[in-house]
Regions:
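Active-site metal-binding motif and surrounding structural segment of the metallo-beta-lactamase
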Residues: 48-52, 59-108, 195-212, 225-230
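Core dinuclear metal-dependent hydrolase active-site scaffold
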Residues: 23-76, 135-201, 266-293
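Structural recognition of the beta-strand scaffold that forms the well-ordered cores
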Residues: 34, 44-46, 51-55, 78-82, ...
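Cap/insert and terminal regions of metallo-dependent hydrolase folds
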Residues: 92, 105-113, 190-266
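N-terminal post-signal-peptidase region of extra-cytosolic proteins
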Residues: 63-68, 215, 326-333
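Positively charged n-region of N-terminal signal peptides that target proteins for export
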Residues: 1-9
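Activation on beta-sandwich/Ig-like modules and their edge loops
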Residues: 286-391
Length: 391
């Protein structure tokens, strides 16, 4: 069955116009805008006046996505792809649907688990507009135009142990170059694609699962041989990413590596003539720089979070949002200004110590598993984070 699928995928990619580097034109250009929104994923692929969104980050990142679309004059999306059902990928979908920005097509993998179809985040977003989701399977091709297309490589089968391994894997091919988009794919799904013969070399690789140590097997890298790779992550939020082993493997094959956390607002990667011709650190026009000097401290036993201003100037946190990633509970701050050296303590409904503000939740912070608190500014950008000290 997998041999048959490999043949079908090869035919699909030929029909889609996959061409050699020697035949690629230097006239066309493809760009991948990778937002620096912490560990969450949100990518905007643009080619010949078409625009395609791959994932939408957390709900709290909507301000960043909205800003990106505005700054690049994107008033219509040709397609929105949800790679899989995790909140750091689908969180912004509903706000996008409610924004009024036209979306020509909503796409998601036909394979997932542990979510009823009626509650699937892509279904909910599309249905809020009276629209439907196009379910994708390996071998499907989405034409882009001007010699470009997306080919669906995976998933090949449902994985009921880890939703990351149900990630929609897309191969974008164009005269400008090719991009392999992996969602949060880990080694298990990588090996499915290797065994099926689904993979081919790419110009740019968007690594799976934030570049952790359960991605990029040697056999996978030998097939895709990227010129460059981009990793969407935040070491502050997820200390094990990117893994040293991941960075070493990419370096060993001569692959240039870009990390979203190393840019300011976004990273714009440009492909032309079958090569990566640019990787620009983007700063939003007319948007203030991220604040500095504010820290978080979580006490999961007391169920409190303390915000401190360690800078020498007052800091306004009006309109900022706090997120607890374990339960994805959020709290919007209003009218709060921290003086130099000042602090603000927020507790849940069951907190017994003295606090400055009550978060209307019984238990905000997990006292059993690792929970990360993130403070987002009004433009959807994380400005600081801290965990609860648990594994």
């Amino acid at each position: 069955m997998r041999k048959v699928l490999a043949i079908l995928l090869a035919l699909a990619m030929l029909a889609a116009g996959v061409v050699s580097a020697a035949a690629e034109s230097t006239e066309s250009k493809a760009t991948l805008l990778c937002l620096n929104i912490g560990k969450a994923d949100c990518l905007l692929l643009s080619y010949e006046n078409t625009h395609w969104l791959i994932d939408a980050g957390y709900e709290q990142n909507w301000g960043a996505l909205k800003t990106a679309l505005s700054q690049y004059d994107v008033d219509r999306l040709d397609g929105v792809f949800l790679t899989h059902c995790h909140k750091d990928h689908y969180g912004g979908l509903m706000l996008l649907a409610q924004s009024g920005i036209p979306v020509d097509a909503w796409y998601a993998s036909s394979v997932w688990f542990d979510v009823k179809e009626g509650q699937h985040p892509a279904v909910l977003a599309a249905a809020s507009r009276g629209e439907e989701v196009s379910w994708l399977s390996a071998g499907d091709v989405i034409p882009v135009g001007s010699g470009a297309s997306f080919t669906v490589l995976g998933p090949l089968e449902v994985n009921e142990e880890n939703e990351n391994n149900n990630s929609l894997v897309l191969f974008f091919s164009s005269p400008a170059g090719s991009i392999l988009l992996c969602g949060d794919m880990k080694i298990e799904e990588e090996m499915d694609l290797v065994d099926a013969g689904s993979l081919t070399a790419c110009t740019l690789l968007k690594t799976g699962h934030h570049g952790d140590n359960k991605t990029l097997s040697d056999s996978f890298l030998a097939k895709v041989r990227p010129e460059a790779a981009v990793i969407s992550t935040s070491t502050a939020e997820e200390p094990d990413t990117p893994a040293p082993s991941t960075l070493r493997k990419l370096k060993d094959i001569g692959c240039a590596v870009y990390e979203t956390q190393e840019c300011r607002d976004a990273l714009l990667i440009t492909l032309s003539g079958g090569k990566v011709t640019g990787a620009d650190d983007i700063i939003w026009d007319g948007v203030p720089a991220r604040i500095e000097g504010v820290t978080l401290e979580i006490d999961c036993e007391a169920d409190t979070v303390t915000l401190r201003n360690t800078s020498g100037a007052p800091v306004s946190l009006d309109g900022y949002t706090l997120l607890s990633t374990k339960g994805t509970k959020s709290l919007r701050l209003s009218g709060l200004t921290l003086e130099p050296g000042g602090q603000w303590v927020i507790g849940g409904r069951k907190t017994t110590v003295t606090v400055d503000q009550t978060w209307d939740e019984k238990n905000v912070w997990s006292n059993k598993k690792r929970d990360v608190g993130i403070l987002y500014d009004p433009w959807g950008r994380p400005v600081c984070c801290a965990d609860n000290g648990l594994d």
